[in-house]
């Protein structure tokens, strides 16, 4: 089911649990974000219209903006007239799959908001380095892929502070920084997760970061028997104890293994 790769949170569901078996993404206010359906074209248009009413003159001139040439070289230069529609530059590689993803995003944004208010332009780089675009901040939308080596929210969230390595938006978030500091100094693991959940929700609610996908691999095949590997596949022991299947697993067999795992997990948590 492709829906399984959609995600609203920075840290993945079913990857981090507290001592009582509670999923980190079930800590509020992160839980509400995880369970929200953000696909709402009508609301997107309403927000854009509200922004236009506040930031534009009656003739569509954007307040504080003048006609000029925007230098995004080596991506290109763009002439702007300081009026609606707002131009958004999406910069990506010339990889076929990435171009398709950019085209899909362009279609979704323009269909939801309307080309009368937004102009989504795609620029693909080839023959020049990533650093010539990313380092001088020559982008409006930055697509990034994050991974972590251990089952703790700090693996991702400490890299997204005001001075963090993954702060590609160059934002200043002292409130977020303070929550991260509280997380790292928490007295218990549960308290640590609570502060991290509040920090992660802060980034998501403020749209500093917009998570939307958990993996680009889609469907995949494996010889590993489900529920015999460690729950989170990190480190050099991630396959310790894993059973290897010689024959394909049917759906009914998978559901049987899943039911047995759920029972065993519930019983194990009672002993904690």
Residues covered by each model-derived region:
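Extracytoplasmic/secreted cell-surface and envelope-processing proteins
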Residues: 97-100, 130-133, 150-155, 221-223
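Long beta-strand-rich cores associated with HINT superfamily self-processing modules
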Residues: 221-272
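Short helices/loops that flank or line small-molecule/ion binding pockets
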Residues: 103-111, 127-140
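Append "and occasionally in soluble cytosolic enzymes with long acidic Gly/Pro-rich linkers
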Residues: 1-107, 111, 198, 251-272
């Amino acid at each position: 089911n492709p829906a399984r790769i959609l995600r609203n949170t920075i840290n993945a569901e079913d990857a981090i649990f507290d001592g009582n078996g509670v999923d980190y993404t079930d800590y509020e206010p992160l839980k509400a974000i995880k369970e929200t359906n953000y696909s709402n074209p009508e609301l997107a248009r309403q927000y854009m219209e509200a922004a236009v009413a506040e930031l534009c003159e009656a003739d569509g001139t954007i307040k504080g903006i003048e006609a000029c040439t925007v230098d995004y070289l080596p991506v290109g230069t763009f002439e702007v007239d300081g009026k609606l529609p707002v131009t958004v530059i999406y910069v990506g590689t010339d990889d076929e799959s990435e171009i398709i993803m950019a085209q899909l995003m362009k279609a979704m944004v323009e269909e939801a908001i309307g080309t009368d208010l937004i102009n989504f332009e795609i620029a693909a780089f080839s023959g020049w380095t990533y650093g010539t675009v990313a380092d001088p901040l020559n982008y409006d939308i930055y697509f990034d892929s994050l991974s972590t080596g251990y089952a703790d929210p700090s693996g991702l969230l400490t890299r997204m502070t005001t001075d963090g390595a993954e702060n590609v938006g160059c934002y200043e978030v002292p409130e977020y920084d303070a929550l991260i500091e509280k997380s790292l100094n928490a007295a218990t693991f549960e308290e640590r997760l609570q502060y991290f959940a509040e920090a992660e929700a802060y980034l998501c609610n403020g749209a500093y970061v917009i998570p939307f996908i958990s993996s680009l691999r889609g469907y995949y095949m494996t010889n590993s028997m489900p529920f015999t590997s460690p729950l989170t596949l990190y480190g050099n022991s991630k396959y310790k104890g894993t059973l290897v299947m010689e024959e394909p697993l049917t759906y009914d067999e998978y559901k049987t293994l899943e039911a047995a795992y759920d029972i065993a997990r519930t019983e194990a948590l009672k002993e904690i």
